[in-house]
């Protein structure tokens, strides 16, 4: 099949296009909703029942997505127009096999295979000429010590394969080496390598969203969303804002030009059609941008685009349109946000099934609460997000944080608040 320009939309269960999502979490759920607005039939596949995406899909399957046999059986039964991986825990060999059989894997099997593995991804990014931090690889404690010494302290260690920043560690001195190695070893899954990176003293970490799609003439075309800012706590997204800065001077214009250049190069290197989310570090003082990682699908930091972007232009809508072969209408190369907005996570600090939420204090003017619908709560699991709009980035960030910190979560008859305050406004 492959991707084709789509000029006719149909009806689910009849003559509409069909998308299959491998992984049906909160990000997949939002993409599904956008696709359903265009009359698309949705099939959700995940490792557990009643995942967020399954709650809105037309049909769903629970299976081990690392099993080739299981994936092939579901795909052959459903025969989707496109297969959209949402998580890393997938048998990528099967994706290549399906692609050879004519199925469209979004953005393409090679992009998924590359982006899920930090060594492959870092080498791919470096090959484009994009600026990166210095880096070394290690396989055991001795080579890890040597890599840290060569890079110098402070430095950052990460497993070659992990999701949502698991196993990442900032080493401030040689005293942190053994602890960092143990953290990486716990999270590195099937890989035996760890990457050690130079610590970049950046002002802001940004997500640059880029999208490749078929234009009205059926030719490949690319667009870029103005970057959004975000911060992480222990490797996990905690808050994001869009645009990344209120400033619009020549220095910012120059930095953004470099951001779009890097995003375009990396997207071209990975290939395929869909949305790409590029994590980068920006050193505004020295006018430098460092490419860090890329996800070839919507990113958790991009949840803010639900509030910031024009209707039909959130990261989820852009991904759905690109995968379906629908042109993205925009004057120029850069899609600008409609509103200044921010997001802030709602975390669980309790454990149990079927969480409940006290949200009465979170509904301030120009704010909204998104509950993902995950059936199980455990410590620091992301269960929802607050979105807020305001006149400035600073005000939007404060508003989202304030609202999120009024939310309480219960899964065992005990209510717990939002306890993490690191990097927060006081």
Curated annotation (Swiss-Prot):
One BP annotation, GO: 'de novo' IMP biosynthetic process
Pathway: Purine metabolism; IMP biosynthesis via de novo pathway; N(2)-formyl-N(1)-(5-phospho-D-ribosyl)glycinamide from N(1)-(5-phospho-D-ribosyl)glycinamide (formate route): step 1/1
Enzyme Commission (EC) number: 6.3.1.21
Molecular functions per Gene Ontology: ATP binding; magnesium ion binding; phosphoribosylglycinamide formyltransferase 2 activity; phosphoribosylglycinamide formyltransferase activity
Reactions this protein catalyses: N(1)-(5-phospho-beta-D-ribosyl)glycinamide + formate + ATP = N(2)-formyl-N(1)-(5-phospho-beta-D-ribosyl)glycinamide + ADP + phosphate + H(+)
InterPro entries: ATP-grasp, ATP-grasp_carboxylate-amine, ATP_grasp_subdomain_1, PreATP-grasp_dom_sf, PurT, PurT/PurK_preATP-grasp, PurT_C, Rudment_hybrid_motif
SUPFAM superfamilies hit by this protein: Glutathione synthetase ATP-binding domain-like, PreATP-grasp domain, Rudiment single hybrid motif
Residues involved in Mg(2+) binding: 279, 293
Lineage: superkingdom: Archaea
Enzyme's top EC category: ligase
ATP-grasp domain: residues covered: 123-324
Residues bound to N(1)-(5-phospho-beta-D-ribosyl)glycinamide: 26-27, 86, 300, 374, 381-382
Quaternary structure annotation from Swiss-Prot or TrEMBL: Homodimer.
Stated role: Involved in the de novo purine biosynthesis. Catalyzes the transfer of formate to 5-phospho-ribosyl-glycinamide (GAR), producing 5-phospho-ribosyl-N-formylglycinamide (FGAR). Formate is provided by PurU via hydrolysis of 10-formyl-tetrahydrofolate.
Family named by the database record: Belongs to the PurK/PurT family.
UniProt cross-references to PANTHER family, sorted A to Z: FORMATE-DEPENDENT PHOSPHORIBOSYLGLYCINAMIDE FORMYLTRANSFERASE (PTHR43055:SF1)
Protein name: Formate-dependent phosphoribosylglycinamide formyltransferase
Lineage, opening ranks: Archaea, Methanobacteriati, Methanobacteriota, Stenosarchaea group, Methanomicrobia
